[in-house]
Amino acid sequence: MAGARGLLCLWLGCFCLNLAQGQRPNLHLPGLRGTESSDRMTGGGPSPDLRPHDKVSEHMLWLYDRYSGSNRAQATRTPGSQLPGPQPLRGGNTVRSFRAAAAGTLQRKGLHTFNLTSLTKSENILSATLYFYIGELVNTSVNCPESQGCSHDSQRQHIQIDLSAWTLQSNQSQLLGHLSVDTAKPYRDSMSWLSKDITQLLRKAKQDEEFLIGFNITSRAHELPKRMLLFPEPYILVYANDAAICEPESVVSSLQRHRDFTAGTVPRLDSHVREALSVERRKKRSTGILLPLQNNELPGAEYQYKEAGVWEERKPYKSLQTQPPEKSRSKKKQRKGPHQKGQTLQFDEQTLKKARRKQWIEPRNCARRYLKVDFADIGWSEWIISPKSFDAYYCSGACQFPMPKSLKPSNHATIQSIVRAVGVVSGIPEPCCVPEKMSSLSILFFDENKNVVLKVYPNMTVDSCACR
């Protein structure tokens, strides 16, 4: 017993001495070594079994947040994920995404096919990038034994990825070009998306009107896993400058043509992407209702209601009635055309007083006035992802002589107002209240092939008004 007690005291003394010298006893606990090796292999990132989300929609939403001034990019990005950094538009106004179709077979090679028919003749390709996922290849690396003490820099794979591009036709296929990518990256899931510039390939394909192309992804020294070729799909981002976007009614020609979308055919975004979009849509909506004033005066300020049921609760009109014809009316009034409306809205006294009060407050001169456009009201909400509505504003008001400097009249508008006021020449109208400065609007939508597109449309929001 005394001998055992002495050995115990000796062991405790050595243990305390090691702690004092900064050394740690080597305690082999079961299960920790396997976890440590796994973390070293993956770089502490997510498990390789975790499949990334819909990167195409997520990447396009990131670009929309960037070019529309939104602050939701961090909310959209999922924890532990990292989007490939986009390149600037460089003077362009369009970003198109193309999702790869199911892998096919061409000369016994797996292909990722892309349908580029959405590219228009007016769109000049500035740059194009192919994004593809190799996370499963990177994370299935050779495990570094703990006994060798491998450093972090040595845990790298230098694998050459070969990309062969093909133009696909009905009866034959033609090689478009070869590219290579070096995957000299650490073992982290955040680095498992690779990208390659394919600008010249797509320019050549567009010039030759070859809009169906395929990419074959192979490795020289390693066999790519079959699962990589199936999910997640590669995608292409094309940055372009649309020369026709400044033409009259360009926003209508590029957006209204998607009316062939039927219910249920519009693609659905990933759940976390839809949640990020819903942050903006949950903002309180205000509806401007212009009251009929039964004269030719300028419309008053709009009514804005915070709740949907306020208008019905207040009951500003009594009923929709048909006015009986008066017997004392002259035949001339009775012979008015059938286009004349026989129904008028009967407003209560409280509503009319409020309308008159707002008319008095409303500036009579040329000014910018509020207008909110909801794409659902014009039937475009099915294919427009964001924004669902925007503040367009409009210009209205008088440009009468003498015009103050605040109306910023042009020299021609000043002379025109003087001639009209003097009355030397009859029939001269007063200058018009028109937009002076306007700003662009970024719109994210689905094209006819159900690919996500970002376009920056100019002159969509009125910033200031002037007399011209």
Curated annotation (Swiss-Prot):
Keywords: Chondrogenesis, Cleavage on pair of basic residues, Cytokine, Developmental protein, Differentiation, Disulfide bond, Glycoprotein, Growth factor, Osteogenesis, Secreted, Signal
Signal sequence region: 1-22
Record field: compositional bias (Polar residues): 72-81
GO cellular component, one term: extracellular space
Keyword field contains Signal: yes
Cell location: Secreted
Family recorded in the similarity comment: Belongs to the TGF-beta family.
Identification of the protein by name: Bone morphogenetic protein 3
Organism of derivation: Rattus norvegicus (Rat)
